[in-house]
Amino acid sequence: MNPLKNLSLCMMACIGMAACSSNQQQETVSENLPYTVIPFEKGVENEKQVKLSDIAEKITFVPMETTDASLLNKVRANNIISVNGTIVIPCFNMGAFAFDESGKFIAPISRKGQGPGEFTRFLSVAGNSDRNLIYVKSSRKMIAFRPDGTFVNEYKVPGIGLPWEYSIIMQDSITLSNIINATGQSQYRLILSNTQGDTLKAFPQYDRFEMPYGMNYAYCNNKENYLYQYKGESVYHDYYCDTLYTVTRDSLLPRYLLDMGKYKLPKNMRLEVAIV
């Protein structure tokens, strides 16, 4: 099944998934492996309908307050986040807007400009509830804000590859950025950098391919987020990679392996070599 890409704004802002119970037939853990193997092929053969009420403890409809200062346009629905009850809604090249849990508008998060706390090109948002911070990704920098819109700090990020590549803050002084393999020949896939944008560690990209004649870039999508944080860990999953990793300062640790079986996509059938 294909994931639903465009959920309504209110649903994205208010649905809370409290707990999910896994079907044991869908996951297997080998005693010799440090990660969980998810047998996709077997799961497809046993496909069944699941009601939202089976996996969600509570559903709340939250209308967003509409004011002259909070008019939303071109919402990045897949990048809506929540930080300690503050709902942050990003809009393409407009910045982000903060609302409380009742939908009342709080403040804009960053604005376009060239000064401290301002972006030249708005790309995405990330959050850290432990630090009570919201991060705005702009070209070559991450900007930190409090949920009330107060500017806190800026972090430089490496200017490598495409401008919309995603970044998150692993620690107070370390930024993790992904490199989209848009040419098929990227040397690295993840970069750890300090607050000045200097590279601390680079993780190699092993998935290489040749570009078809007449193409400049392979498949890439500025609406996809390959990095996120979950329970204090930084998580990474690339577009065509079958493994989900957690990232530390020193290594990539495999957590889940999606065993596609006969559904594994051949390299020559990938979107990146099929789009002309």
Predicted regions and their residues:
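Sec-dependent bacterial lipoprotein signal peptides
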Residues: 1-18
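Eukaryotic scaffold repeat domains enriched in small/polar residues
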Residues: 20-276
